[in-house]
Amino acid sequence: MFDIGVNLTSPQFARDHDAVVARAFAAGLSGMLLTGTSLHESEQALALAQRHARCWSTAGVHPHDSSRWTRETEQRIRTLAQAPEVVAIGECGLDFNRNFSTPQAQEAAFSAQLALAAECGMPVFLHCRDAHERFMALLTPWLDKLPGAVLHCFTGTRDELQDCLRHGLYIGITGWVCDERRGLALRDMLPLIPANRLMVETDAPYLLPRDMTPKPGSRRNEPAYLAHIMARIAHWRGEDAQWLSGETDNNVRTLFGVAM
């Protein structure tokens, strides 16, 4: 049971990284991917991955930070990507929901990171919100040059899901699906995702599953809660959770080349 999306560089984890990681492995995780969302956080994620066994990281710039993308950023991400613990370029993509960076800056940074991933022969860890058409237009020409791609924290429509699957993307599902207010449509789509295209993630410390009982004392999500998300996903898909965990671990090995 591998968590492909842990924001361990978040200030919410600053005081207890080691305890969070220990709880995750005590809860049965086989490994976790620490997300880099800026140059600084990519450097931090790598340092944490080097500190903890069975942890790997990504290196990239989130669309929110795209306005900070420069040639120097690109070179430093390229250098980070040479570390054995870095197994994907990202988190990169487009987010037209809040536009913390302009769409033009987002597209430029996304395209540059796709080119960098192709140059390095690495998969991409992707973000898309309210931008599917433009996201796919930029991504599709690169897909045959990349070893693979996962769209992290999918929350799109049925048509968008089917489009992503047609293009061979892996789909990351978070505790969003456990939200009785926002997650019902995604819950209904779960059976559409082939088991060999599914990955699971907490996106911790965000997206604490709302249906956990008893509720955690803190609203902070943790990778230790991945077992709950996996069990709920398996239930709604009509599958055995242990079997599905094995399938998603195989997908992680295939895309990221990690040894768990």
UniProtKB/Swiss-Prot annotation:
Q: Which domain of life is it from?
A: Bacteria
Species name: Enterobacter lignolyticus (strain SCF1)
Which of the seven top EC classes does this enzyme belong to?
Answer: hydrolase
Q: Could you list this entry's UniProt keywords, alphabetically sorted.
A: Cytoplasm, Exonuclease, Hydrolase, Magnesium, Metal-binding, Nuclease
Its EC number(s): 3.1.11.-, 3.1.13.-
Binding positions (a divalent metal cation): E91, H127, H152
Q: What is this protein called?
A: 3'-5' ssDNA/RNA exonuclease TatD
Q: HAMAP family from the entry?
A: TatD_exonuclease (MF_00901)
Q: Which family does it belong to?
A: Belongs to the metallo-dependent hydrolases superfamily. TatD-type hydrolase family. TatD subfamily.
Q: Tell me, how does this one assemble?
A: Monomer.
